[in-house]
A protein has these predicted regions:
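C-terminal catalytic core of tyrosine-transesterase DNA break-rejoin enzymes
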Residues: 120, 138, 187, 191, ...
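Short amphipathic beta-strand and strand-loop transition segments with alternating hydrophobic
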Residues: 1-5
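C-terminal secondary-structure termini that scaffold catalytic or DNA-interacting sites
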Residues: 211, 224, 230-238, 242-247, ...
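N-terminal core-binding DNA-recognition domain of tyrosine site-specific recombinases/integrases
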Residues: 53, 66-144, 158, 271-273, ...
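N-terminal DNA-binding module of tyrosine recombinases/phage integrases
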Residues: 6-12, 16-103, 256-257, 263
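Active-site/catalytic core of tyrosine-dependent DNA strand-transfer enzymes
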Residues: 167, 219-222, 244-289
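Catalytic-site neighborhood detector that most strongly recognizes the C-terminal catalytic loop/helix
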Residues: 163, 220, 248, 319-344
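Basic, Lys/Arg- and aromatic-enriched nucleic-acid-binding interface segment
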Residues: 119, 123, 138, 142-202, ...
């Protein structure tokens, strides 16, 4: 393998490899930004051509990703990227794929289950890892899939949804108001329906007090001690949420307390773990039923549908659902009541017409 700098100041790599027929072939690739990038690309290419699994998991993921990129819809691929890059690569990325055993998968599963994810989300994440190993067994002769031996986690069907009424939320909020980050954070979650990662990624410039809006265009997670900011899983996740006057004034009050904050600075400089701890504290002090942080999002949806009678397409836009079917399937149990209310209103309209 030869790696040289070209006249543009970029790096070229040239090497020989054996293709799937065992024939020696020459390859020349140009214009890498660094020598390291050129070398790594060549090494991956050689591995791909030889179908040799003596590689790190993250290298095989790139092979799998390149193949699936030709076969999956963009939204499906984006969701896959999101899960693998945030939930799988930090744990398995540097491990040799042939050395990952069922016991390793179970340890990873145990770590996931500690984080309070929903049962359906746990199943979804586990399925993504299993799919990569299935691909390796089918096309690259990996002897067996360690995920099959480890068993699955989570559930394919969601459990009964839990959410707070407005009265329950206000009781809870009263018990965490001693900490500004908790008070204003939970207030924003409840009255916007945003996800916890979206809340944590909000910056000062995302809050427009004059227009009374919040801009959602990114998500925050703390992974292996690092702050990780990623775009939403889907394009619909990028949205502008309109705010009630009450919340605008509350957020203005909160911002006024953040000394020296710059436009690009995060509004809530903490983590999901902090809010999870505060939820436990608040529910114990208030006596309201225990729900997950994500269920506050469901509480907002319930408010929109049951109290305000908002149509599914508007709910989908506000929550950032890619498809209206997601909204309808998630909250189908709330819409029958709305259908009955609609019929009652039609009856009133008919009766008023007859009286005239």
């Amino acid at each position: 393998m030869t790696v040289t700098k070209n006249t543009k100041g970029l790096w070229d790599v040239q090497f020989y490899y054996k293709d799937y027929r065992g024939i020696n072939m020459k390859k020349h690739k140009r214009n890498f930004r660094t020598k390291k990038e050129a070398t790594e690309w060549a090494e991956r290419f050689i591995v791909q051509q030889s179908h040799n699994l003596d590689m790190e998991f993250e290298t095989f993921w790139q092979i799998y990703r390149a193949d699936m990129g030709q076969r999956l819809r963009e939204n499906t691929l984006r969701s896959k990227d999101y899960i693998v890059e945030l939930k799988i690569l930090p744990y398995f990325g540097k491990r040799k794929i042939t050395e990952i055993k069922a016991a390793d998968v179970r340890l990873w599963q145990n770590e996931l289950m500690k984080k309070g994810y929903s049962q359906t989300y746990l199943r979804s994440v586990n399925n993504q890892l299993a799919a990569i190993f299935n691909y390796a067994t089918k096309y690259y002769d990996l002897p067996k899939n360690p995920c099959n031996q480890a068993g699955t986690i989570g559930k394919g069907k969601a459990e009964e949804m839990k959410f707070w009424t407005q009265e329950e939320f206000e009781r809870f909020l009263d018990c965490v108001k001693d900490k500004p980050v908790s008070y204003y954070g939970f207030l924003t979650l409840y009255w916007t329906g945003c996800r916890i990662g979206e809340l944590l990624a909000l910056t000062l410039e995302d809050f427009n007090a004059e227009e009374k809006t919040l801009r959602i265009n990114k998500s925050y997670q703390r992974i292996n001690g690092r702050d990780v900011i990623t775009p939403p899983k889907t394009e619909k996740g990028k949205r502008i949420i309109t705010l009630p006057d009450y919340l605008v004034e509350e957020l203005k009050e909160y911002v006024s307390r953040l000394y020296g904050i710059m436009p690009e600075d995060r509004l809530f400089m903490t983590t999901k773990a902090y809010f999870e701890h505060e939820m436990i504290r608040g529910t114990e002090l208030s006596g309201v039923k225990r729900i997950r942080i994500h269920d506050i999002r469901h509480s907002h949806a319930s408010l929109l549908i049951s109290k305000l009678g908002m149509q599914p397409n508007l709910v989908a836009d506000r929550l950032g659902h890619e498809k209206i079917q997601t909204t309808l399937s998630t909250y189908s149990h709330l819409y029958p009541d709305q259908a009955r209310k609609l019929a009652d209103e039609l009856d009133k309209l008919i009766e008023s017409g007859e009286e005239e």
